[in-house]
Curated annotation (Swiss-Prot):
Its main location: membrane. The keyword Cell membrane applies. Residues 1-22 form the signal peptide. The lineage of its organism: Eukaryota, Fungi, Dikarya, Ascomycota, Saccharomycotina. GO terms for cellular component: plasma membrane; side of membrane. It comes from Candida maltosa (Yeast). Disulfide bonds join 72-101, 214-347, 232-263, 369-420, 378-444, 397-402. SMART domains: X8. Residues 487-519 have a biased composition (Low complexity). Pfam families: Glyco_hydro_72, X8. GO terms for molecular function: 1,3-beta-glucanosyltransferase activity. This is Protein EPD1.
Length: 549
């Protein structure tokens, strides 16, 4: 009798678990300067943790944190203990499969914000470029992860501009944002926000944020992250600088959050800033933050230490847990935010502290570069190492005008072939030199570094080459190509349909239906908990079955 009375309830619970586990997290959408769940319009606050080994200064290798299912299985329960709903990952290997980790994160109610670059494929502040190689890297990450609805967004750059000496580099990052957004749209993927993560340099931070937020929506950042380390030890809203920062960004018009935070100048960290960040002084402007970082390393920023499959929580973990579980931020509905009509900020003017032009670098277009390369008679030899390119550039460009391959983001002047790859650009200037020397055979040698080829111009190339001009000083309108990426989409769940995130399913039983930061949200039954209930239920059924046999 007892079994008969329990069975319907247990079966119902098990059925609910199966349904919940299969349900995708609703995409997060942007309305005004806030994030919202797309399924019910409730506000979403980022309660995040940076999740990657800190080996990103290397130019060769990095560890993809989402390609190791065992590590994800080990770490996610600890992320859940501190109510994490976002992790930030800084570099991903598109040749790996991420299905298992992404599904485990999905089941735990955790979204990701992923950087599109990797250590040796990123925009270099000292020699900024937005070229075909970078475009293909960025779009390969998009192709790999677009299908997961728990991808909150992408960062197109991290601290690329970090002081007054390199503000021009921001133009290249903004061009990357423009073209990544255009690529997502052209591929028919769901709307996935693309933003930027900045350092907190007092001389440029306001202009930097305004630069990325301003202008046409097709080329502006969808959100802005600030790596904020001003609050150290015991401080306050005013003394920490949080008050002035909040005032600085109150009219930005797009979501802003701490893309890193957690000063460790005073240890152990108390994380008293958490209550302020999610309190009434800041939540109208800020949308939460991402604690730096999960793993303990030499930099002493870790919340846990790891040895193989074993995890040990540190004092910082316990302090953060105490603070983050005690927040109860106010929230609004997307409909109310939409009605408020938040407007975007205006672009900064060029000053001594800000020199990035609002005229952005051109879109990398493989067709244009291929047409140019095929039309050349003198080209760099295939056996020349890319390490030797700089010497050849220096020599040739000291003798001829290389403006056709150069990019000046201060004046907004860009050569027609500036987005092409290094080999194509070097061949172009070698050919210019060769032609200026009346095509003397000796002018296409460079000690064996150059060689002659048969030039050809396809009919489809004529318009490109004519617009660019012989010296590449003309203007050629590139277009976003959708057939350049070699990355394949992971087999994980998620919608790949086009259109706004708001077109997603109207219900989700695996995520909070209210504010992600509220205390009540923390008491919601998670999929993990329900799975345990189902397992217990099955055990009870088996046990009673054995008893009645």
């Amino acid at each position: 009798m007892l079994l008969n009375s329990l069975f319907p309830s247990i079966l119902a619970a098990a059925t609910f678990v199966t349904s919940a586990a299969a349900e995708d997290l609703p995409p997060i959408e942007i309305v005004g300067n806030k994030f919202f769940y797309s399924n019910n319009g409730s506000q979403f606050y980022i309660k995040g943790i940076a999740y990657q080994q800190n080996n990103l200064d290397s130019n060769s290798t990095f560890v993809d944190p989402l390609a190791d299912a065992d590590n994800c299985k080990r770490d996610i329960p600890y992320l859940e203990q501190v109510d994490t709903n976002v992790i930030r990952v800084y570099a991903l290997d598109v040749t790996q499969d991420h299905t298992e980790c992404m599904q485990m994160l999905q089941d735990a109610g955790i979204y990701i914000i992923a950087d599109l670059s990797q250590p040796d494929e990123s925009i270099n502040r000292n020699d900024p470029q937005w070229n075909l190689d970078l475009f293909e890297r960025y779009t390969s990450v998009v192709d790999k992860f677009h299908n997961y609805t728990n991808v909150l967004g992408f960062f197109a750059g991290n601290e690329v501009t970090n002081n007054v000496s390199n503000t021009d580099a921001s133009a290249f990052v903004k061009a990357a944002i423009r073209d990544t957004k255009a690529y997502i749209k052209a591929k028919g993927y769901r709307t996935i926000p693309v933003g930027y993560s900045a350092n907190d340099d007092s001389d440029i931070r306001v202009s930097l944020a305004r630069y990325f937020a301003c202008g046409d929506e097709d080329e502006s950042a969808d959100f802005f992250g600030m790596n904020m380390y001003e609050w150290c030890g015991s401080s306050s809203f005013k003394a920490s600088g949080y008050e002035s920062a909040t005032d600085d960004y109150k009219n930005l018009g797009i979501p802003i959050f701490f893309s890193e935070y957690g000063c460790n100048e005073v240890t152990p960290r108390k994380f008293q800033e958490v209550g302020t960040l999610f309190g009434s002084d800041m939540t109208d402007v800020w949308s939460g933050g991402i604690v730096y970082m999960y793993l303990q390393e030499e930099n002493n920023y870790g919340l846990v230490s790891v040895s193989g499959s074993s995890v040990s929580t540190l004092q910082d973990f316990n302090s953060y847990k105490s603070e983050i579980l005690d927040i109860s931020p106010s929230s609004v509905q997307a409909s109310a935010e939409s009605a408020s009509g938040v407007s975007r900020t205006s672009c900064p003017t060029n000053t001594d502290n800000w020199e990035a032009s609002t005229e952005l670098p051109p879109t990398p277009d493989k067709d244009i570069c291929d047409c140019m390369s095929s039309s050349l008679k003198c080209v760099v030899a295939d056996n020349v190492s890319t390490d030797d390119y700089s010497d050849l550039f220096d020599y040739v460009c000291a003798k001829i005008d290389c403006s056709g391959i150069n990019a000046n983001a201060t004046t907004g002047d860009y050569g027609a072939y500036s987005p092409c790859g290094a080999k194509d650009k070097l061949s172009f200037v070698l050919n210019l030199y060769y032609e200026e020397q009346n095509e003397s055979k000796s002018a296409c040698d460079f000690s064996g570094s150059a060689s002659l080829q048969s030039a050809s111009t396809a009919s489809s190339c004529a318009a490109y080459l004519s617009s660019a001009g012989v010296s590449g000083l003309g203007t050629v309108q590139g277009s976003v190509r959708t057939d350049t990426s070699e990355a394949t989409t992971d087999s994980g769940s998620g919608s790949s349909n086009s259109g706004s995130a708001s077109s997603s399913k109207s219900t989700s039983s695996s995520t909070s239906s209210g504010s992600s930061g509220s205390k009540s949200a923390a008491t919601a039954v998670t999929v993990t908990t329900l799975t345990k209930i189902a397992a217990v239920g099955v055990s009870i059924i088996v046990g009673f079955g054995l008893i009645t046999m």
